[in-house]
Swiss-Prot record:
SUPFAM superfamilies assigned to the protein according to its UniProt record, in alphabetical order: Ribosomal L27 protein-like
Cellular component annotations (GO), alphabetically ordered: cytosolic large ribosomal subunit
Any Pfam family: Ribosomal_L27
UniProt keywords, alphabetically: Ribonucleoprotein, Ribosomal protein
A molecular function (GO) term: structural constituent of ribosome
Gene name in the database record: rpmA
Organism the protein comes from: Bifidobacterium adolescentis (strain ATCC 15703 / DSM 20083 / NCTC 11814 / E194a)
BP terms from Gene Ontology: translation
Protein name: Large ribosomal subunit protein bL27
Family under the similarity heading: Belongs to the bacterial ribosomal protein bL27 family.
Length: 83
């Protein structure tokens, strides 16, 4: 029975990159149109006024203004209050 593995037969030795998810702009912070507000998997936060959602559920500002987090119909919602 071999006491060493053959060349390049190691099964470990790989790792995935961090996903960098989470809230990027917090309540009260100023945002410019296009700024990412939340990066998420699924809709933990839903888009509200002046907020768009990308295909990976990223929320982003559609207008310049300040970020406001709230709850509407038992859903966490993110709004941008236009400046």
């Amino acid at each position: 029975m071999a006491h060493k593995k053959g060349a390049s037969s190691s099964r470990n030795g790989r790792d995935s990159n961090a996903q960098y998810l989470g809230v990027k702009k917090f309540g009260g912070e100023a945002v410019v149109a296009g700024n990412i507000i939340v990066r998420q998997r699924g809709t933990k936060f839903h888009p509200g006024e002046n907020v768009g959602m990308g295909k990976d559920h990223t929320l982003f500002a559609l207008k310049d203004g300040s970020v406001k987090f709230g709850v509407r119909r038992d859903r966490k919602v993110v709004d941008v209050i236009a400046a």
